[in-house]
Amino acid sequence: MDKKSLILTLLHLKGWGAKRVYLYVQRYNYDYEKCVSELIEELNEEEKTAFKQELISSKKTIELNSQVGTKVCCILDKEFPKKLFLSSSPCVFLFYKGDISLLSQKSISIIGTRKPDSYFVEKGKIATTFFAKKGYVIVSGLALGCDTIAHSSCLEAGGKTIAVLPSPCDNVQPTSNRQLAQRIIENGGLLISEYSTGSTMTKFNYPQRDRIQSKLSEIILIIQANDQSGTMIATRNCLKDGKRVYAIKGNRISIVHNYVDIDSPEELEEITKWIF
């Protein structure tokens, strides 16, 4: 049993989940050997039986993902960034394609509505290009509209981008963005997901995806949204974790208090002071 099999097994064990897994490995200072040795004391008899069965399933899951070119990373791996679990609603396991090291680089999440107005489309391109050329990794969700603008503009500027998916890495949704996903990987970017190959898409995947987006960056920039937008999920998560949220000037969003004039290099530069 390796690190990844251990974490995936615990994650799917009845009565566990990401929060308990995080607290367990934290208790033993993220020491794999210690986590394994203490399992006998941690699990009751029913859990021990379930663990053995779930371990077989976890190993098969990892192998199936490997067969479709998807790798895995967990909280016990050194490349798994602390910002994913040292906050509310921790993430402890990821499936991915591409350069996993991007998770530890300075980044900004650029998100928004699936149907932006032409004015905000242009402003979104300008903003994304500015940050990409500064060397910041651009994080978004590969949805239509503002997410597509963020990823595409970043690639056109020669930057690196991370797409956080609500679907498995080998089954990109929406299908119309599968070519864009391939371009992201080919240009040194990264696709990440909490969902294994073969997983069924549900409406609950989207808020979980948005939660990951908010964890990866210290800053969120909203291209266009309103109070009813799904973008508010990531926005609220970001604010809850004490991070800064900006919106392009012209938006009216009740919980956002920082607006930026995209035509002002000084205002864009000011945002970079909060990216660490």
Model-derived regions: residue spans:
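Short, positively charged patches
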Residues: M1-K125, T129
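Glycine-biased, small-residue-rich flexible motifs in mid-sequence functional cores and linkers
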Residues: I75-F276
